[in-house]
């Protein structure tokens, strides 16, 4: 395939080939979706913000011995990544009750969980990304027992690192979604992105349930000032690291 041929387009990113078959170019879009793409819109500047935030977080995780697909960013909205085979599993780590966890249980939003809750969803839009047990994952052969154990270990470690990091930015990490892939050597690698699109982030300077939201919930719940929330996350990360 020729250089920069479109390989795949998702809701928030486009993947392109490069001259190196083992390296892909990810373009971060300003498009926003929610509720399995039932709600669509545009968040101005989101692509550049998410790309920059993800690059900083991937670098942080790499220094803490979490392997990622990140290589570098040739532009503010583009990221070069190692080619991996994505596992069709969305891994969710929750520290505070919010979103679907509240809808599916009697927990109220804001309840601090006794321990980090690690959940798995089948990445399948047709099925609306159903919650899966470990045994269902194994029966569907979405991952091996060894891979699931490693995924959980990585997820818990990533959570510890990010809680500490965001706390230093005066941001509370409520929950987040991550994805993993396998490289050509079958090594498990963190892929996709970590940004306000995939994390719930609350401003520690705010107490109002709506004002504190700094993530895509501002878009989901029509809270307004979506761009401002994303930009504030980026500014605090840059200020902390600068």
Swiss-Prot record:
Under catalytic activity, the entry for this protein gives: 5-amino-1-(5-phospho-D-ribosyl)imidazole-4-carboxylate + L-aspartate + ATP = (2S)-2-[5-amino-1-(5-phospho-beta-D-ribosyl)imidazole-4-carboxamido]succinate + ADP + phosphate + 2 H(+)
Give the pathway listed in the UniProt entry for this protein: Purine metabolism; IMP biosynthesis via de novo pathway; 5-amino-1-(5-phospho-D-ribosyl)imidazole-4-carboxamide from 5-amino-1-(5-phospho-D-ribosyl)imidazole-4-carboxylate: step 1/2
Q: Which UniProt keywords apply?
A: ATP-binding, Ligase, Nucleotide-binding, Purine biosynthesis
Q: Name one GO biological process term.
A: 'de novo' IMP biosynthetic process
**One Pfam family recorded for the sequence:** SAICAR_synt
Q: What class of enzyme is it?
A: ligase
- Is the keyword Ribonucleoprotein assigned to this protein? no
Protein name, please?
Phosphoribosylaminoimidazole-succinocarboxamide synthase
CDD domains, sorted? SAICAR_synt_PurC
Gene3D superfamilies named in the record: ATP-grasp fold, B domain, Phosphorylase Kinase, domain 1
The entry's family comment says: Belongs to the SAICAR synthetase family.
């Amino acid at each position: 395939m020729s250089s920069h041929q479109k390989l795949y387009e998702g809701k928030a990113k486009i993947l392109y080939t490069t001259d190196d078959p083992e390296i892909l170019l990810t373009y971060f879009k300003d498009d926003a979706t929610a509720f399995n793409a039932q709600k669509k819109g545009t968040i101005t500047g989101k692509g550049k913000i998410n790309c920059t935030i993800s690059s900083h977080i991937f670098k942080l995780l790499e220094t803490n011995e979490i392997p990622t697909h990140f290589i570098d960013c040739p532009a503010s909205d583009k990221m070069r990544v190692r080619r991996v085979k994505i596992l069709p599993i969305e891994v969710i780590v929750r520290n505070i009750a919010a979103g679907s966890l509240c809808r599916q249980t009697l927990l109220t939003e804001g309840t601090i969980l006794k321990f980090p809750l690690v959940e798995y969803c089948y990445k399948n839009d047709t099925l609306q990304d159903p919650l899966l047990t470990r045994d269902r994952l194994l029966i569907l052969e979405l991952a091996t027992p060894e891979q699931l154990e490693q995924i959980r270990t990585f997820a818990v470690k990533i959570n510890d690192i990010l809680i500490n990091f965001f706390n230093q930015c005066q941001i509370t990490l409520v929950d987040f979604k991550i994805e993993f892939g396998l490289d050509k050597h079958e090594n498990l690698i963190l892929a996709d992105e970590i940004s306000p699109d995939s994390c719930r982030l609350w401003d520690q300077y705010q107490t109002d349930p709506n004002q504190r939201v700094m993530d895509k919930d501002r878009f989901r719940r029509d809270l307004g000032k979506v761009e401002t929330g994303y930009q504030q996350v980026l500014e605090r990360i840059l200020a902390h690291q600068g």
